[in-house]
C-alpha cells in the first residue's frame, strides 16, 4: 500500500519515532510511504531550495559568517543537482539519502541564517568543464587535499579536484617522505586554513590488537567489494589478489 502524507498549507511533518541532533525532526514537503520488507520506506519530496534549508545547518554551523554559509549553499546545491542526475537511488524512488553517504539533511534544524544563505544564492551552482561541478567538500583539512582519483577512485582527473597544499605560506608542494619531516608536519606549528579547528591536529591511542582487528575488518570489507584493490606482495616483488584478508605482523611501512 502506498501512502502520501500532505501537511496543511505551510505545515511540516514531524516524525516522533526518529531522533536527530535537535530532537524529533520536522520536514517540509510531503511524505511518500511504502511497506518494504516489513519496514516503512519513507521518501520526503520537496523543492530543492527547501531541501537546502536543512542541509546547510547540518553541514556547517550557522554561527559562521554569512558569506561562508552562502558558499556552503552553492556547494550543496551543486552537489545535489549532480546526484539527482546520477540517479544512484533511482531503484528506491529517491535522489539522495539524508546521511554522509550524500550530504547530511535535517540533522540540525533550519534557521534564519541557513534560509537566508539559500535564498540569497537561489539557483547558483559551481560550473566547470562545461557542466555542473562535483563539489565534494569536507569538514577539516589537515593542510593538504587529495585528488578525486585518490579519494573516489574516479577513472579520470578533474581539473578542479586535484591534490594541493593548503598552507598559509607560499609552499606549493610538501616532501614528507622522511619520518622526521612528516612528524614535524603533524606536530609543528603549521599554519593552514583550518588551524583553529579542534580537529586540525588530534591524538588518540589504540592497542596493537585493536588496530590489527580494525584494519583486518576493513581489508576484508574492501576485498568483498572489489578483490582487485587488495593485493599481496609476492616474493618476486609483484602484487597479486590472493584473497588474504587477515593482517599479519607489520614489518615495514613504506
Language-model segments: residues:
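Conserved, single-site charged/polar hotspot
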Residues: 1-254
